[in-house]
Amino acid sequence: GNPITLSGKVILPAKGPIKRYILVSHYTIASNAEAPSNIFSLEGLLVKLGYALIIPDYLGYGVTADHIHPYLVMDLTARNVLDMYLAVVPFLEAAGYAPEYDDIYLMGYSQGGATTMAVQHLIEHHGDYNIKIRRVFAGGGPYDVKATYDRFVETNYTSLPCAVPIMMQGMIVGNKLDVDMSKMMSPSLYANLDEWVNSKRYTTSQIDALIGSNTTSDLLSSIGMDRTSREVSELYKAMTQNSILTYSWKPQAPVFIMHSIDDDVVPYENATRAKSKWQGANIQYNLGHFGGHVKAFIRFIYTVQTLLINEEKEEEGNYDF
């Protein structure tokens, strides 16, 4: 395809040496104001531990805000993330910001949780990058995209209404599907899609308010709700291809997966399906009643912080007995 320039943010410790790089895949956003290059991402809290954070904007945000974001198109988004890492690291090292250790952490929550696993797959499956992964931290991720979308239709309810059009459009545009979106969305949602979603002016909660309903059948047409229709079967095919759990791959580097049983946006079954698919991999699961999707994100950040502190102690031989 044609080359495209992407943007992102690097957060460096104020002083002292850099321990390692943390490559962050960002969570679901809707407005360009929320893009990592435009705000201080919550993951940035980890910089105080001495890590440098590399946080790419996905295609459709930052300098490419005029593009439609191919939401949950895994390989493409993972490539965005990895490309920024490959571009930024030589620049940082030349500027005197080389880390003490040459292995890296991958991290992401929500959309970023699935994306960070896709980044791990990209690095491990195509071994010519010569990137050593120390550990991967994934939280609240839609590892099975079809199952996540299916829940919206099955229950006729979504706690994040904006996810329905963003996911549908991302799959159709990102996979170049021959599907007419106007047949799948409600007339009012389709009529407002460019203003509400593609203008990148509104946050997820603002779009939810504009949509004004949590009932899936208010957002989709009868064709969009019919899982036997040609349009939906094409959509499901694309969602299956973009689900990291359908890859014939098992994570090699150690992984930490966290998911709240009470997640109201990304169903908990994503974690149980991951556990079933990736049996035998070096994965630590932290599954429990951590509240809804957003509340669990805060817990995820602080849990990762604790894990990083503990890993440092082990590395330095300072064990707490």
Over which residues does each language-model region extend?
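C-terminal catalytic histidine-bearing segment of alpha/beta-hydrolase fold enzymes
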Residues: 231, 235-242, 265, 269-321
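Alpha/beta-hydrolase active-site loop
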Residues: 71-94, 120
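Gly/Ala-rich beta-loop-alpha elbow adjacent to hydrolase catalytic centers
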Residues: 108-112, 116, 263
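Short substrate-entry loop that stabilizes the transition state in hydrolases
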Residues: 15-19, 24-54, 59-65, 265
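Short beta-strand/loop motif that positions the catalytic acidic residue
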Residues: 251, 256-263
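Accessory cap/linker subdomain of secreted extracellular hydrolases
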Residues: 139-248
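Acidic catalytic loop of the alpha/beta-hydrolase fold
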Residues: 145, 261-266
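N-terminal cap/lid segment of alpha/beta-hydrolase-fold proteins
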Residues: 1-20
